[in-house]
C-alpha cells in the first residue's frame, strides 16, 4: 500500500485498524495497543523502535534455539534461557500467540525431550512467521506517521 498518498489522520486510523485486526486474529493482545500508546510519553520513535528491536531479537533467539537443538547433546539450560528471553519479549510487546508457544517449549525443556522441543520450536517459528509480516507492515505505517510528524516540527 502506498502510504504517501494518504493524509496523516487516515494513516493513524489505518494503524489503529491494523492493530485491531491483529487483536481479532489473536496474534497480539491489548498490551500491543498499550505499547503503541506509550509513544505519547516516550517519544514518537518508541513504537517503531520497539517493533524493530522485538523482531530482530526474536529472530536471533529463534536461530540460537535452532542451533542448540541441532547439537548432538542438547543444552537444556541454554534452551531454557533462550525460551525465557523470547517469552518475556513476546509478553512485553503483547505477542500472545508467540508467548503461548514459548510455554509449550518450556514444558518440553522441563521434560528434557528433544522431540517435543523440536515440535515446540517449529510452533514458535510458525508463530513468529505469522507475526512478522503484519508487524513489518505496522512498522512501515508507523514510520511514515513518525516521519510526517517529525517534518511538522
Annotated model-derived regions:
Residues 1-153:
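Two-component system phosphorelay core
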Amino acid at each position: 500500500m502506498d502510504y504517501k498518498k494518504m493524509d496523516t489522520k487516515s494513516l493513524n486510523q489505518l494503524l489503529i485498524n491494523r492493530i485491531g485486526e491483529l487483536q481479532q486474529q489473536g496474534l497480539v493482545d491489548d498490551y500491543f495497543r498499550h505499547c503503541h500508546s506509550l509513544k505519547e510519553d516516550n517519544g514518537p520513535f518508541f513504537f517503531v523502535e520497539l517493533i524493530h528491536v522485538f523482531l530482530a531479537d526474536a529472530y536471533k533467539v529463534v536461530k540460537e534455539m535452532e542451533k542448540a537443538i541441532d547439537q548432538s547433546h542438547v543444552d537444556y539450560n541454554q534452551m531454557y534461557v533462550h525460551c525465557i528471553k523470547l517469552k518475556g519479549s513476546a509478553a512485553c510487546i503483547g505477542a500472545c500467540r508467540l508467548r503461548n508457544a514459548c510455554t509449550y517449549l518450556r514444558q518440553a525443556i522441563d521434560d528434557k525431550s528433544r522431540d517435543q522441543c523440536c515440535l515446540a520450536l517449529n510452533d514458535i517459528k510458525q508463530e513468529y512467521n505469522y507475526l512478522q509480516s503484519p508487524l513489518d507492515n505496522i512498522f512501515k505505517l508507523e514510520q511514515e506517521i513518525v516521519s510526517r510528524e517529525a517534518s511538522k516540527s
